Swiss-Prot record:
GO biological process: regulation of DNA repair
Entry-linked PANTHER family: REGULATORY PROTEIN RECX FAMILY PROTEIN (PTHR33602:SF1)
One Gene Ontology cellular component annotation held by this UniProt entry: cytoplasm
Task of the protein: Modulates RecA activity.
InterPro entries recorded: RecX_HTH_1st, RecX_HTH_2nd, RecX_HTH_3rd, Regulatory_RecX, WH-like_DNA-bd_sf
Major place of residence: cytoplasm
One Pfam match: RecX_HTH3
UniProt entry keywords in alphabetical sequence: Cytoplasm
Localization per Swiss-Prot or TrEMBL: Cytoplasm
Family: Belongs to the RecX family.
Protein name as it appears in the record: Regulatory protein RecX
Length: 166
C-alpha cells in the first residue's frame, strides 16, 4: 500500500473499489460484497482494507442510491446475456441463485423476459447437429442430453420434435 492510499479512510477506498468493479459490468449485491471483502493485490502481495461492517453497508447503500447497484437490472441483463449464449432457463436460474438473487426476483424477471425457449433450444440443436435434426432415437438422445446440460426444460426439448413438421 502506498503512503497516500494508506492515509485515505477505508470507506473512501471501498467506495472507489466498488465503483471500479461496477464500471466493468453489473454485479449482484452478493457478488459486490464478496469482491469488496477480498484482499486487494498490491505490489507487495495481498493487502487487506481495514474497513468495518458499517463501512461496507454504507458503500452498498451509496451504490444503490446512485444507481450503480440494481439487482433487478442485473437479473434482466444476465438473462439476456446468457440466453444469447445459448443457455436455457434452468441453467440461468441456477446461476442466478449462485449469485445470490432470490427465487422471486428470478421468476419475476423470467416471466418479464420475452424469450422463446423452444426456439432457442431448436437453434442450439441445429447449430450443433445440423439441419434437419436427426430422427433416429440414439441421435435424439444425444441432442436431448446436450440441451438438458445447456439448461433447457424437457418440455421445450420435446417440442422440437413435436413441431418437426413446421
Amino acid at each position: 500500500m502506498t503512503e497516500s492510499t494508506s492515509r485515505r479512510p477505508a470507506y473512501a477506498r471501498l467506495l472507489d473499489r466498488a465503483v471500479h468493479i461496477l464500471a466493468v459490468r453489473d454485479h449482484s449485491e452478493q457478488e459486490l460484497r464478496r469482491k469488496l471483502a477480498a484482499p486487494i493485490m498490491g505490489k507487495n502481495g495481498p493487502e487487506e482494507i481495514d474497513a468495518t461492517a458499517e463501512d461496507y453497508e454504507r458503500v452498498i447503500a451509496w451504490c444503490h442510491e446512485h444507481g450503480y447497484l440494481d439487482d433487478s437490472r442485473f437479473v434482466a441483463r444476465f438473462i439476456a446475456s446468457r440466453s444469447r449464449k445459448g443457455y436455457g432457463p434452468a441453467r440461468i436460474r441456477q446461476e442466478l441463485n449462485q449469485k445470490g438473487i432470490s427465487r422471486e426476483a428470478t421468476e419475476k424477471a423470467m416471466r418479464e423476459c420475452d424469450i422463446d425457449w423452444c426456439a432457442l433450444a431448436r437453434d442450439q440443436a441445429t447449430r450443433k447437429y445440423g439441419e434437419p435434426l436427426p430422427t433416429v432415437f440414439s441421435e435424439k438422445v444425444k441432442i436431448q442430453r446436450f440441451l438438458l446440460y445447456r439448461g433447457y426444460l424437457m418440455e421445450d426439448i420435446q417440442d422440437i420434435w413435436r413441431n418437426f413438421a413446421d
